[in-house]
Amino acid sequence: ASDVYKRQEINFPIFPIPNNIKDENEFEDITYIQGKSWISLQADDCKNIWDFFSVFSNEAFRYYLPAVIYISFEELIKFQKLKDSDILVDCTCQNMIGRMRDDLDIFRKFSFIQLQTIREWLLDLGEENSGLNPYDYKECVTWLSLLIEEKSIEAI
């Protein structure tokens, strides 16, 4: 987990911060996170943002996903388990598999390295910490593996 954690900041850009972060069909108030960079979010923010991933626009989902990875890796390294981020991780993983099933192109916008980081994060989390049932967890890891393979073929 620590290797991915250290590379995290390099793999995902901090700027630009997206302006339109809410899906147009959603009405929840997510001003708490508006204008904040993903790197500025900490474990204590989890109680305020755990349900935001379901209302995020695709752009905001891609932008803020590294925050969840960063926060959860920090906890796994420090406590050997998820602490404050457990519900945030569950909701994010549930939302991630839903978005994959709806539109895989959302994930094609991630780079090869970013996709590898997301997959490593899921594998390090393990099925029990992801909040996903075994089928959804395997499907999520498989989709990420296929997208990584697709990116590596494009690079040839």
Question: PLM features: what roles do these ranges have?
Answer:
Residues F15-V55, E59:
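Short, contiguous, well-structured surface segments enriched in hydrophobic/aromatic residues
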